[in-house]
Amino acid sequence: KEALMQLESLLWQCPDWDLRTRLEQLQTSYKYMLEYMRQGANDPERWNVYRKLVADTWEIADRSRLLMLDNASSRYYHEVRRTPRPESLSAYTLKKLLHMLESFNDDLAVSGLLSDEKMDEVLKRHEETLKYMFLQTWTNSAWTPEEEEDAQSMLTSELLPVNDLCLFISAVTLSLMECFDLRKIMWLLDAYRHPDVNAGQRALVGVIFIFHIYRNRLSLYNDLVKRVDLMDEI
């Protein structure tokens, strides 16, 4: 209860109304749970409800902390997050970036037949695409279901250069170091199974770091616990 009160106080300084709404819903669920306990109700799902309440509280606190630091911190991470994205880049979703990266090898081969200048243009465009993909992924605190699906396409693509995939894995790992996101953790576990050994090992290193950082929170997520139980290597 004290944690919820402190979080409510923190959110008064936060401009995100969605987070406030989530907190209000969480507080309501917590009150109902306490009332059922006072009535002596035998609820077999009580422990699961409690774990979800704690997990949601952590996540709201994470998002609130980031939003407040975005307005105050001089760290490059927060500078990138608070800098408005140019309108010309608004259409560059992860799916769009994937298509651009997939065409790199063909574009490079064609440009090599034309001129060194054309080849330099392709190389520069590829470098800029990677930079934008990295920054966008690193500073994204929570994937939407659509973004998670696009990230899965990165793993299944047969045209994406492995080095580009490895950079994306690093960006996901660094993003998780800034803010917990269950979707990204589950994705890293998928990436660990990638057939390319370099991609798989990079994902494994990321998983180990993330599991250490959030070791006190992992048990709150049943799906994650079940997933890890099936992986003897970790």
Located regions from the model:
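Positions within ordered alpha-helical repeat solenoids
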Residues: 9-12, 28-35, 59, 63-66, ...
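Hydrophobic core segments within long, regular secondary-structure runs in both alpha-
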Residues: 24-31, 148, 182-189, 225-228
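Short, Lys/Arg-enriched charge-dense amphipathic segments
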Residues: 42-46, 206-208, 225-226
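Alpha-helical solenoid scaffolds in large eukaryotic transport, assembly, and signaling factors
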Residues: 92, 96-194, 199-200, 206, ...
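Eukaryote-biased recognition of long, low-complexity, charge-rich segments
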Residues: 220-234
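Extended, helix-rich scaffolding/adaptor regions
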Residues: 1-110, 125
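Solenoid-repeat scaffolds in large eukaryotic assemblies
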Residues: 3, 19, 200, 220-221
